[in-house]
Amino acid sequence: MKFLSALLLIVLLISVVFGNTSGPSSAWATTTTGGTTGSQTSPATHGGHGGNGGNGHSNIDIHADVGLLDTLSVHARVKANVADTVNVKAKARVEA
């Protein structure tokens, strides 16, 4: 569980750093968590995606999968586009 907590903290930090801060209608991108754990008969569902930036150009799309089989594995893919000029992609994988 502490691996998932650490991963969520990293995701939130990236959201703050790459949130939309330009334009008169600037707003932080929002993220949602959730999804279900998969099993051999039912696949895991995905967590929510980040919200769009206030000016319509910046957005952060956060995608995290958590699967429990023999080990705990957390997969997160973060993609940020800031003002159509900066493209940032980060991947993290933690296994217990």
Curated annotation (Swiss-Prot):
Q: Which residues are glycosylated?
A: 20
Q: Which cellular components does GO assign to this protein?
A: extracellular region
Q: Where is the composition biased (Gly residues)?
A: 47-56
Signal sequence coordinates: 1-19
Swiss-Prot/TrEMBL keywords: Glycoprotein, Secreted, Signal
Where is composition skewed (Low complexity) in this entry?
Answer: 27-46
The identity of this protein, by name, is: Uncharacterized protein DDB_G0282307
Region of interest called Disordered, as start-end residue ranges on this chain: 27-58
**Compartments (UniProt record):** Secreted
Which organism was this protein described from? Dictyostelium discoideum (Social amoeba)
